[in-house]
């Protein structure tokens, strides 16, 4: 029988069919090799957009810098970064006029945050440029290394543990004539392996002291390391993203805190909220425009796209914005917030690993590090690379490129959103003073513009005026990539709007399935994903039930835990069958132990262990939840864990799921091969750091989360806490006198050791 596929959609409103257009099956593309070429592209492009600016030289580092601010007004439609200071300031003033007190209140909120934030805020985040080792490290390690170097150079403000004091150290470090750092290096030697009798390369790690003069230190402090952005779909070319070092991060954090506080108060801002809250906020703006245009006016919406948003933004412009926003605030606060944009005006982009050369005939490979690009003969490169290198050469210093204009990806998302909203805000009739007016939505570089006017000419005029106003502040709306529609149908940040936001369930497809963490977490994440999609993405009951059955099937194949009474043979089936036969209450067995699946769409919110607890045999309960089981290296599991789920589009999302600790919550051991590499010293530092943090958590468990405040070090805080707890336990009879005395003695010994060290 031939089925006409259009019949399937007779009962479905057209907008709900969006999930059938899903293009993203299969794995996203990942980048391999070096990101040097992409970074050079970014640097060269950014300079090209601002080429008519003024060149100056940084007196401290000798870096050539291009300043496009207040440059020539654009005469064509090419993207450009010539923002006009007075226009930006005026846009800020009008934004404040329409939202009285917005800047004042946000400054007060931020001031409170600045005074309370502790330096461990900087340990959040993944890879961070570690300036002491000149490469990327986990954030916690990079911070620890920075603090260690500061200490050994006599900077100790940070011992208080407040972020603001760490930033004082950063400022002081920039005035020092030289900074001494400890860096890791690798020695290789060829030795004969006793067992195989072959020659092998043995690597040993050394630590050596190195002095950096003021210029070298400043270059490192202002460096952003670059990497290639992975897993980007729908693009032919990869692009570079940046990761800043610890000197810049703290300052950026405070600026973004201020900008976030402003965005929260702006109805046109798509940040910092997300999900359903964001949809509700945006639907409001659309509703407002449609209600006002009902009878007499036309209303059109542009699904907007900006050309190279962050390469045309300029840190100097952000400095002007911050200066205006904080104009009535205390001097110290204004200074702290203005440092981030100043550092970005003087930033250096590290070019990454350099190029790899291969000689097919001689079977040789050699790496040309970025530092050599300034002097190497260009005859070895192909034409496009040669052009890139020639262009970037005047900007190179020590393997980094001076990059004053532009912002690099993902740095000031909130603040640039404030700038975008300030232009949307100018669309009110009292500012346009004509028959057309506009409003819209802005989320970082993505925007939707809604224009209302009595006729088509008015709509055109409104769009033109918006376009030109944007140009004045360095925003370039792309005429090629933006499209216009009657209001009611548009796309914004991958949300599709058609008389209301349409649930695009297919975007969530990649997050269905088995995550591969461990049996316990995978079961919990799997059912939580289904539950969340029923709540947020119109996943209907029948489809959810099917998704659940497919998930259980997938899970059983992944962990080879088919039901105990199945005919399927795997390498676990012998053990599982035995367990099945010995178990009295078979319904109590977890799916991962060959038990039946008791989940249906009504009980997805209950962790499997809790769901089956009453049904379990007593000895099975004892085995399952036994913290003393020697075969399990236990994570101490909070009641809620976070999983990273990958939607098809947009950034990885963090998702909470219930975690009940059982003997199935195992953690795979770390691969041993790392122990033979240059990472070993770092790994040991990291483990030491981890141990200290775990110990600290023991003394200040999150259930009693009163963080120790004040000027004590971690050790002092733990000792004083131990004394208080011991006294309470002794007085209430929980511990004996001898134990109490022993604890007090240990505390005194620790303090004595600390005194001797100092």
From Swiss-Prot:
Residues 50-82 are annotated as: Disordered. RNA-dependent RNA polymerase which is responsible for replication and transcription of virus RNA segments. The transcription of viral mRNAs occurs by a unique mechanism called cap-snatching. 5' methylated caps of cellular mRNAs are cleaved after 10-13 nucleotides by PA. In turn, these short capped RNAs are used as primers by PB1 for transcription of viral mRNAs. During virus replication, PB1 initiates RNA synthesis and copy vRNA into complementary RNA (cRNA) which in turn serves as a template for the production of more vRNAs. Keywords: Eukaryotic host gene expression shutoff by virus, Eukaryotic host transcription shutoff by virus, Host cytoplasm, Host gene expression shutoff by virus, Host nucleus, Host-virus interaction, Inhibition of host RNA polymerase II by virus, Nucleotide-binding, Nucleotidyltransferase, Phosphoprotein, RNA-directed RNA polymerase, Transferase, Viral RNA replication, Viral transcription. Residues 55-64 have a biased composition (Polar residues). This is RNA-directed RNA polymerase catalytic subunit. Its main location: host cell. Belongs to the influenza viruses polymerase PB1 family. Influenza RNA polymerase is composed of three subunits: PB1, PB2 and PA. Interacts (via N-terminus) with PA (via C-terminus). Interacts (via C-terminus) with PB2 (via N-terminus); this interaction is essential for transcription initiation. It comes from the Viruses. The gene is PB1. InterPro entries: RNA-dir_pol_NSvirus, RNA_pol_PB1_influenza. A motif (Nuclear localization signal) lies at residues 187-195, 203-216. It comes from Influenza A virus (strain A/Chicken/Scotland/1959 H5N1). It is found in: Host nucleus; Host cytoplasm. Its EC number is 2.7.7.48.
């Amino acid at each position: 029988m031939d089925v006409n596929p259009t019949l399937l959609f007779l009962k479905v409103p057209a907008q709900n069919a969006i999930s059938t257009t899903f293009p993203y099956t299969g794995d996203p593309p990942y980048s391999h090799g070096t990101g040097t070429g992409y970074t050079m592209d970014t640097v060269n492009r950014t300079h090209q957009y601002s080429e008519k600016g003024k060149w100056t030289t940084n007196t401290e580092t000798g870096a050539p810098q291009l300043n496009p601010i207040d440059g020539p007004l654009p005469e064509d439609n090419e993207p450009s970064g010539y923002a006009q200071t007075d226009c930006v300031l005026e846009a800020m003033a009008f934004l404040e006029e329409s939202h009285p007190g917005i800047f004042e209140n946000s400054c007060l909120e931020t001031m409170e945050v600045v005074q309370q934030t502790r330096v461990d805020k900087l340990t959040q985040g993944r890879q961070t440029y570690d300036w002491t080792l000149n490469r990327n490290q986990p954030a916690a390690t990079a911070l620890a290394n920075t603090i260690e170097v500061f200490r050994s150079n006599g900077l100790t403000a940070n011992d208080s543990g407040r972020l603001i004091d760490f930033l004082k150290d950063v400022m002081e470090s920039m005035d020092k004539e030289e900074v001494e750092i400890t860096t890791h290096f690798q020695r290789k030697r060829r030795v004969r392996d006793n067992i195989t009798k072959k020659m092998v390369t043995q690597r040993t790690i050394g630590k050596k002291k190195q002095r950096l003069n003021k210029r070298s230190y400043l270059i490192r402090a202002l460096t952003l390391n670059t990497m290639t952005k992975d897993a980007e779909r729908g693009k032919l070319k990869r692009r570079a993203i940046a990761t800043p070092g610890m000197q810049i991060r703290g300052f950026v954090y405070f600026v973004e805190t201020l900008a976030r506080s402003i965005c929260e108060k702006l109805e046109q801002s798509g940040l910092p909220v997300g999900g359903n809250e964001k949809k509700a906020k945006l639907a409001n703006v659309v509703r407002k425009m449609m209600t006002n245009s009902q009878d007499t006016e036309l209303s059109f919406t542009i699904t907007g796209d900006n050309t190279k948003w962050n390469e045309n933004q300029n840190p100097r412009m952000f400095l002007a914005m911050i200066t205006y926003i904080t104009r009535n605030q205390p001097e110290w606060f204004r200074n702290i917030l203005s440092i981030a944009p100043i550092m970005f005006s003087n930033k250096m982009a590290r070019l990454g690993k350099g190029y790899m050369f291969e000689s097919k005939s001689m079977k040789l490979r050699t790496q040309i590090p970025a530092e050599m690009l300034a002097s190497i003969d260009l005859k070895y490169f192909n034409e496009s690379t040669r052009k890139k290198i020639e262009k970037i050469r005047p900007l190179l210093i020590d393997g980094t490129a001076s990059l004053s204009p532009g912002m690099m990806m993902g740095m000031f998302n909130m603040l640039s959103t404030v700038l975008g909203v300030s232009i949307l805000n100018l669309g009110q009739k009292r500012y346009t003073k004509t028959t057309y007016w506009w409003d819209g939505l802005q989320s970082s570089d993505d925007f939707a513009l809604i224009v209302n006017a009595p006729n088509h000419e008015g709509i055109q005029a409104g769009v033109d005026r918006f376009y030109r106003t944007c140009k004045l502040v360095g925003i370039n709306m792309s005429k090629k990539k933006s499209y216009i529609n009657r209001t009611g149908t548009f796309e914004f940040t991958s949300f599709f709007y058609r008389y209301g936001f349409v649930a695009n369930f297919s975007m969530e497809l990649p997050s269905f399935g088995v995550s591969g963490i461990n049996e316990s977490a995978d079961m919990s994440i799997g059912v939580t994903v289904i539950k969340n999609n029923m709540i947020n993405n119109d996943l209907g009951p029948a489809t959810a039930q099917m998704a659940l059955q497919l998930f259980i099937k997938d899970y059983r194949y992944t962990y080879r835990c088919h039901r105990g009474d199945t005919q399927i043979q795997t390498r676990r089936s012998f053990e599982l069958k035995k367990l099945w036969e010995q178990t009295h209450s078979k319904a109590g067995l977890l799916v991962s132990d060959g038990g039946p699946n008791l989940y249906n769409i009504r009980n997805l919110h209950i962790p499997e262990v809790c769901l089956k607890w009453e049904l379990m045999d007593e000895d099975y309960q004892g085995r399952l939840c036994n913290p003393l089981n020697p075969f399990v290296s236990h994570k101490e599991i909070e009641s809620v864990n976070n999983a990273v789920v990958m939607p098809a589009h947009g950034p990885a999302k963090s998702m909470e799921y219930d975690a009940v600790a059982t003997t199935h919550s195992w953690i795979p051991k770390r691969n041993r091969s790392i122990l033979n590499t240059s990472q070993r010293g770092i790994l040991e530092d990291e483990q030491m750091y981890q141990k200290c943090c775990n110990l600290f958590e023991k003394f200040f468990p999150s259930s009693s989360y009163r963080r120790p405040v004040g000027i004590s070090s971690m050790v002092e805080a733990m000792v004083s806490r131990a004394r208080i707890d011991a006294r309470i336990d002794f007085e209430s009879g929980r511990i004996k006198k001898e134990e109490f005395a022993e604890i007090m003695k240990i505390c005194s010994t620790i303090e004595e050791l600390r005194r001797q060290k100092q």
